[in-house]
Amino acid sequence: MYTQNTMKKNWYVTVGAAAALAATVGMGTAMAGTLDTTWKEATLPQVKAMLEKDTGKVSGDTVTYSGKTVHVVAAAVLPGFPFPSFEVHDKKNPTLEIPAGATVDVTFINTNKGFGHSFDITKKGPPYAVMPVIDPIVAGTGFSPVPKDGKFGYTDFTWHPTAGTYYYVCQIPGHAATGMFGKIVVK
């Protein structure tokens, strides 16, 4: 008889196997887009300085932005956070509230030394399949390189949203299915 813990363990094994298979046949890159050559490298002190540039204010599990130009800084799997997840202002997968009509400058940092990640924006909400098909409206970052040599990868993009509800999602197989996504409310 399966217990809840056994079923959960089997589910994670299945997700992991699917992700490994997808990576083996090249589907991980296909799901997240092509390897983006705009990625740059940063040291840990540089990453810490970038994280400080986020212009949002935290209230509970929400980060609220104001003004005509906002700067969102999201990181993939900072130390002390569960894998896989995004962190903004030391919050795991927070809801981001952004004013309609604002220019949104996004910096996405991959600090996870074991995996590449993506930060894509879509209208499709959860739940997400192991192999997500989300039709991103902003294929934000492409597929990140895996950090190496004591450095981390980061990239920037700009988004001009209209009012509505969106989601930021990692399209690497298995990541969104296990919780690597968050909500964006533009109003």
From Swiss-Prot:
Subcellular location(s) of the protein: Periplasm
Annotated signal peptide: 1-32
Pfam families: Copper-bind
InterPro entries: BlueCu_1, BlueCu_1_BS, Cu_oxidase_CS, Cupredoxin, Rusticyanin
Domain Plastocyanin-like: 85-187
CDD domains the UniProt entry points to: Rusticyanin
PROSITE patterns reported for this sequence: COPPER_BLUE, MULTICOPPER_OXIDASE1
Keywords from the UniProt entry: Copper, Electron transport, Metal-binding, Periplasm, Signal, Transport
SUPFAM superfamilies (alphabetical): Cupredoxins
Binding of Cu cation, residues: 117, 170, 175, 180
Subunit-level organization: Monomer.
Function: Electron carrier from cytochrome c552 to the A-type oxidase.
Name of the protein described by the UniProt record: Rusticyanin
Annotated source species: Acidithiobacillus ferrooxidans (strain ATCC 23270 / DSM 14882 / CIP 104768 / NCIMB 8455)
Gene transcribed to yield this protein: rus
